[in-house]
Curated annotation (Swiss-Prot):
This is Putative HTH-type transcriptional regulator in exeN 3'region. InterPro entries: Sig_transdc_resp-reg_C-effctor, Tscrpt_reg_LuxR_C, WH-like_DNA-bd_sf. Pfam families: GerE. The lineage of its organism: Bacteria, Pseudomonadati, Pseudomonadota, Gammaproteobacteria, Aeromonadales. Keywords: DNA-binding, Transcription, Transcription regulation. The keyword DNA-binding applies. GO terms for molecular function: DNA binding. SUPFAM superfamilies: C-terminal effector domain of the bipartite response regulators. It comes from Aeromonas salmonicida.
Length: 196
């Protein structure tokens, strides 16, 4: 991974394109296989050191076949970078991670299945079918309007389902829902996640 290699060589915090970190030395075979597997046409990485020994890397990929990122697009990313970096440092300031230890090491095919099962079963029988659907779409990053459109319900109904599921699961935010989901995924042995 060119980003990881660059980070190991001292890549500083910031917004970096693949071309910048590879400095024109990217293996064409790696590029072909990576982009064919992901469907991405271009990649940009946000390098976010959050504390000693912990650096987050957030990758954004372009799926359409337009030209490379424009200077304006990169400038906008660089403009929001300080805020994103600050929020990440605030979120990950703890010295100990909050994620549980995995009980299994799934291969790539079973990992996809495990993620799908975990999404469909997060919250267990505490949630209604519709609340589980809303939770699954929240975990996929959809906003209220997109969830409403996907489920054929109103925005207010989505907000009510979100409020109820957060209350039932004692959550206060999407970040807490995501943390709950990750722990659910990590601690359930592959194939043992029960979908209500």
């Amino acid at each position: 991974d060119p980003f990881m290699q660059a980070l190991e060589q001292g890549l500083p915090a910031g917004v970096w394109t693949l071309a910048q970190v590879s400095q024109g030395r990217l293996d064409p075979e790696y590029r072909h296989h990576f982009y064919q597997a992901t469907g991405w046409q271009e990649e940009v990485g946000l390098i976010l050191p959050v504390r000693d020994g912990l650096t987050l890397m957030l990758f954004l990929g372009r799926l359409d076949k337009r030209s490379t990122l424009s200077r304006d697009e990169l400038a906008r990313l660089e403009g929001v970078f300080p805020l994103v970096h600050s929020l990440c440092r605030q979120q990950w300031q703890q010295s100990q991670p909050l994620l549980a230890q995995s009980t299994a090491q799934p291969d790539s095919t079973s990992l996809k299945s495990a993620v799908e099962q975990a999404m469909a079963s997060v919250g267990g029988d505490r949630l209604t079918r519709r609340e589980r659907q809303v939770a699954e779409l929240l975990l996929q990053g959809l906003d209220t309007e997109a969830i409403a459109a996907a489920l054929g319900i109103g925005n207010g109904t989505v907000k009510n389902h979100r409020k109820h599921l957060y209350g039932k699961l004692r959550l206060g935010s999407r970040a807490e829902l995501f943390n709950l989901f990750l722990n659910h995924l990590i601690t359930a042995p592959v194939g043992d996640i029960q979908t209500p």
